[in-house]
């Protein structure tokens, strides 16, 4: 929920969704772009891990399939289904008010409660789509020896949906306004008997994740050294865009007024349209754009957005 001073005050961002990624003074928004930036700037060839392990099918690059799977299925229809399992009492809390502002219309707890059975049915439909692949032959969702982006995206959404359906996490989600004593409504749909393939995959993935070392570090709010590090980089060049198969299409983007130096607004194409990020267009690529925010924060950064899932518009008379 808002406020998120790290976004607004520190970086000058009106964009309200998390997570974001900062690599030096370059800030990346949306998980889809964050993943590609991490893979590019911290490649396996330098000893880093990857969520695109080698394919077991010689010569087949599945990366585009995994990216589309995560962006167009897991993050959209499957996500909408799992949010429909949130306990109705949550929508009567300040979190519900916040989400109504994000979505752009009011949320009626009683109407949403009446839709839970419908949403459970949709949840089961998604499990049914996954079951044949995981039951018949595949260890993972893509033909790989280790989990890929496809597995990570589905696992997170499925785990979150199962937890939120029984109220786990809603106390924190609602700022302490709703307790965590809900009924486990998802187990009637997702269980070993109905979907043994998905069930086995789910537990296999959890075992794999548990076997990995915990490399996470935490920075307290009192530690501001990282801000000083960014300030020292303000005079340096931006990292630029993550490489794509084809370079920028300047002729096509020019027809839309998307040329370097103009003022643009950037908003998600689903929710959060009321919080546009306005800034000077720095780079324009096929999959990504970067801007220098008009609103100045504590540190001056270059902000990157993916083009899929976002609407970029030039501001009239904005040529600089």
Describe each PLM feature range.
Residues 1-117, 141, 251-252, 258, ...:
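GST-like domain detector, emphasizing the conserved glutathione-binding G-site
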Residues 35-39, 127, 131, 202-206:
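Non-transmembrane alpha-helical segments in soluble domains
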Residues 43, 135, 139, 210-211:
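Generic structural signal for secondary-structure transition and capping sites
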Residues 73-201:
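GST-like fold's C-terminal all-alpha helical module
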Residues 185-248:
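Catalytic cores of secreted or luminal carbohydrate-active enzymes
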Residues 196, 238, 252-260:
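Catalytic lobes of large eukaryotic enzymes
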């Amino acid at each position: 929920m808002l406020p998120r001073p790290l976004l607004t005050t520190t970086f000058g961002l009106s964009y309200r969704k998390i997570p974001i990624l900062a690599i030096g003074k370059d800030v990346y928004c949306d998980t889809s772009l964050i993943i590609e930036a991490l893979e590019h700037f911290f490649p396996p060839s330098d000893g880093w891990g990857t969520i695109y392990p080698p394919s077991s099918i010689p010569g087949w690059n599945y990366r585009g399939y995994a990216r589309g799977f995560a962006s167009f299925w897991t993050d959209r229809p499957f996500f909408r289904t799992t949010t429909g399992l949130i306990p109705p009492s949550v929508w009567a809390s300040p979190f519900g008010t916040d989400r109504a502002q994000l979505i752009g219309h009011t949320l009626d707890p009683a109407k949403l409660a009446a839709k839970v059975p419908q949403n459970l049915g949709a949840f089961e439909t998604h499990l049914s789509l996954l079951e044949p692949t995981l039951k018949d032959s595949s260890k993972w969702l893509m033909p790989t020896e280790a989990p890929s982006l496809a597995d990570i995206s589905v696992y997170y959404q499925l785990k979150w949906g199962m937890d939120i359906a029984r109220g786990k996490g809603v106390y924190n989600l609602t700022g302490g306004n709703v307790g965590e004593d809900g009924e486990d409504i998802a187990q009637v749909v997702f269980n070993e008997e109905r979907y043994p393939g998905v069930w086995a995959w789910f537990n296999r993935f959890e075992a794999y994740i548990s076997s990995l070392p915990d490399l996470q570090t935490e920075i307290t709010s009192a530690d501001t050294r990282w801000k000083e590090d960014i300030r020292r980089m303000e005079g340096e060049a931006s990292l630029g865009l993550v490489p794509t198969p084809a370079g920028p299409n300047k002729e096509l983007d020019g027809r839309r007024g998307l040329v370097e130096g103009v003022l643009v607004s950037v908003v998600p194409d689903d929710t959060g349209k009321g919080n546009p990020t306005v800034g000077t267009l720095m780079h324009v690529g096929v999959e990504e754009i970067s801007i220098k925010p008009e609103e100045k924060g504590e540190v001056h950064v270059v902000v990157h957005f993916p083009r899929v899932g976002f609407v970029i518009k030039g501001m009239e008379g904005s040529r600089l």
